Structure formats: C-alpha cells, structure tokens
C-alpha cells in the first residue's frame, strides 16, 4: 500500500504542469518553430517584393515596352506582403517572449493563453493572404475565359515563378503557424490541468 502511494506521488510530480521534460521540449519546440516561421515569412516577403519583371515586345520598326509586372499592381499581392510582414514581426516578438519564458523556467498561463490566441489569429491572417495570392497566381497562370482575362505567365515568366515561390513558402509558414497554434493550446492545457 505504501509503495503504491509513493509511486502515485512520483507520477503526479513528474507529470505536474510546468515540470518535467515535456514542458521544456515543448518550449524548445516553440522556439525552433517560431524561428522557422520568421525565416519562412521573411523569405516569402523578399521573393514577392523582388518579383518585378519588365518586358519589351519587338515589332518591325521599334520595340514596344509593355507595363512591368510587379506585386504592387494587385491589391491581393499587396495584402499578401503586408500580412506576411505582420506575421514576420509577430514571429520576432513571440520568439523573444518564448525564449525569455524558457530561460526563466516559468511560463504563466496568461502568457500561454496570449500565445495561443495570437497564433490562431496569425494562422487566419497568413492563410487568407496565401489564398488571396494563390488566386491571383492562378489567374496569371490560367487566365479566365469567361471574363476574357488572358494568361500572363507565358509573358512574365520570372514574375510568375517569384509569385509561385512566395506562395509556396507562405503555405509552409501557414502549416508552421498551425503547428504552433496546436502546441500553444496543448501547453496551456497542460499548465491549467
């Protein structure tokens, strides 16, 4: 009987919220994922901002310069850059907050709740920006016959590759944010349990 009580107490101590290796590994996982989020959002922003391409059409006589393709031509792509900039800034702030809490070996329930809420908000923002950018990219690639919007990717190939790459990295950032959101909620659950 005495042996069972000791065993139960040891088990409760090792699984108590805020103790043990689970919380440490969870915090370290959050730090790593937040750094990966920073790298992904920054990469996506840089690729999108550097996507400008200018083309000249050569007809007999004189070359004609057609308008440059750049992200500022589309409100959806501007939203994409702004949303990812917000997520990039959030990743910097949340990484510092998480590292600070990790160094103190104490992560309050209020901090975990704030991280869980903000991670969920950022998932929505980045996912919506990825969808908006993806819609514009699809129109550029395939066009829309019903409203007579032509394809542009056969003309602006470099621009379309940049936009596609930025959207792919942004989709990866959305998955990282989703994982962070799940980890934040699980950490909060373990803390208040």
Swiss-Prot record:
Residues 52-76, 130-162 are extracellular. Keywords: Cell membrane, Membrane, Transmembrane, Transmembrane helix. Coiled coil: none annotated. The keyword Transmembrane helix applies. The keyword Magnesium does not apply. The chain crosses the membrane at residues 31-51, 77-97, 109-129, 163-183. Residues 14-24 have a biased composition (Polar residues). It is a multi-pass membrane protein. Pfam families: CASP_dom. GO terms for cellular component: endosome; Golgi apparatus; plasma membrane; trans-Golgi network. It is found in: Cell membrane. Residues 1-24 are annotated as: Disordered. Its main location: membrane. Residues 1-30, 98-108, 184-193 are cytoplasmic. Homodimer and heterodimers. Belongs to the Casparian strip membrane proteins (CASP) family. This is CASP-like protein 1D1. It comes from Arabidopsis thaliana.
